[in-house]
Amino acid sequence: MFFNSLLTNFAALEVGQHLYWQIGNIRLHGQVFLTSWILLGALLVFISFGTKKMENDPKGLQNLLEFLWDYIRDLARTQIGEKVYRDWMPFIGTLFLFVFVSNWGGALIPWRLIKLPSGELGAPTADINTTIALALLVSLSYFYAGLSNKGWRYFEYYVHPTPIMLPFKILEDFTKPLSLSFRLFGNILADELVVGVLVFLVPLILPIPVMFLGLFTSAIQALIFATLAAYYIGEAVEEHH
């Protein structure tokens, strides 16, 4: 009884105000959906323009997109392995681009100029619900990768190299999504808060270098998230001897 009450109170905790959409019994964070759709739409437009007229000698947007493609391919090949990396390139690439665009969108776009009935817009990755959803998606993906490539032999991983490792391997399955989600959430939220406070206190000069540092941090966090996702998938499909 006490435990259920504690969980209920913990789930009710909020930081700031939020815009909610009520769909039946489901309560959604409206501002997260709005910013996600806007950023995904901008990303799709960017990609469609870059691939509209493909040339043998790439330049402009096509050159940038081919660079990203090569980078994601090399990342997936290095972390997952030569055998199955092609199957996971779209997933790793989508993760990287969504996190990257979400992080940079929060740093570059003045969302607070858009007034809402309640709450305010910001980077989707500055919301813990988004980062937890992404981390759980990664967890489901590496479970699927292991089972689809090895079948029931995948569970041998939990007792390799010795059965003593079983509780630690199970605990690891819980800590992986926690570390993924809280690392991304904490870094992006902290960056938004620091820039917001500096803009309020010293609105002219000081926030600019901090914003550039935030852009660098945002790109690094997207790279870390995609790299760890690929590493976990590679770990799941790796053959243990």
Curated annotation (Swiss-Prot):
Q: Name one GO molecular function term.
A: proton-transporting ATP synthase activity, rotational mechanism
Pfam families listed in its UniProt record: ATP-synt_A (PF00119)
InterPro entries this protein is in? ATP_syn_F0_a_bact/chloroplast, ATP_synth_F0_asu, ATP_synth_F0_asu_AS, F0_ATP_A_sf
UniProt xrefs under SUPFAM superfamilies = F1F0 ATP synthase subunit A
Listed Gene3D superfamilies: ATP synthase, F0 complex, subunit A
| Function of the molecule | Key component of the proton channel; it plays a direct role in the translocation of protons across the membrane.
How this chain assembles, per its entry, is: F-type ATPases have 2 components, CF(1) - the catalytic core - and CF(0) - the membrane proton channel. CF(1) has five subunits: alpha(3), beta(3), gamma(1), delta(1), epsilon(1). CF(0) has four main subunits: a, b, b' and c.
What name has this protein been given in UniProt? Answer: ATP synthase subunit a
What is the species listed in this Swiss-Prot or TrEMBL entry?
A: Prochlorococcus marinus (strain AS9601)
Query: Which gene carries the instructions for this protein?
Result: atpB
